[in-house]
Amino acid sequence: MSETEDVKRPRTESSTSCRNCGKEGHYARECPEADSKGDERSTTCFRCGEEGHMSRECPNEARSGAAGAMTCFRCGEAGHMSRDCPNSAKPGAAKGFECYKCGQEGHLSRDCPSSQGGSRGGYGQKRGRSGAQGGYSGDRTCYKCGDAGHISRDCPNGQGGYSGAGDRTCYKCGDAGHISRDCPNGQGGYSGAGDRKCYKCGESGHMSRECPSAGSTGSGDRACYKCGKPGHISRECPEAGGSYGGSRGGGDRTCYKCGEAGHISRDCPSS
């Protein structure tokens, strides 16, 4: 057999050596000599410290100090990883691990005991602690309350807007500090300087789907390609059951189902 054919040959049980006993034909997890140290291979279990198997196949209890290289960052003991830790988390047990919610060492954010506090949320590259809350005063700033250390979805200060210098402005009410989906001021439009303009009524401050003047034909430059009238788009056309002629707007839009101009296939009345 050539070297190329040998490389391409699929791996079978006959070509597999057990790392526990060194014999071919089975894996370590199926080894009939599981209690033996086998041929003393270099594989060492970091749970019990014995050679011949890996931690996921370990038949023994975890032992402190078994594998010096592996250290649990929850309790600080060697011999297991955090996901297998049988002990309670000890603050500061693992130096270098820092929770981004409270800023303390020794646990990750998912294990944070202060998860209900106002310090939740992300942080920027420049990290600094902001007082008793333990939150980071990095680049992230909440656009609801203006405080640093959390983002809007984690804001503990409700829906109220703020008068900070942020560039977020709601196009529904014109107030800074929140976006339209979080607006506490209802559907009312505003006469701000925003560039958002409803093409139904021609007023700024809202989009067509939120327009309080649904019956208005407006002065927008958008035209429905179904009926040719301005003020709405095809999916909102009140004349959906009408005939579709090429002279009723729609330009070069042609349905590939019926061949008529003025609509596309998903809106075809002849389907």
Curated annotation (Swiss-Prot):
UniProt-listed PROSITE patterns: ZF_CCHC
Annotated GO MF terms: DNA binding; zinc ion binding
Signal peptide limits: none
SMART domains in the record: ZnF_C2HC
One Gene Ontology cellular component: nucleus
Domain of life: Eukaryota
Transmembrane segments: none
Record-linked InterPro entries: CCHC-ZF_NABP (IPR051714), Znf_CCHC (IPR001878), Znf_CCHC_sf (IPR036875)
Annotated keywords: DNA-binding, Metal-binding, Nucleus, Repeat, Zinc, Zinc-finger
Zinc finger (CCHC-type): 16-33, 43-60, 70-87, 97-114, 140-157, 168-185, 196-213, 222-239, 253-270
Keyword field contains Zinc-finger: yes
Name recorded for this polypeptide: DNA-binding protein HEXBP
Organism: Leishmania major
Gene label: HEXBP
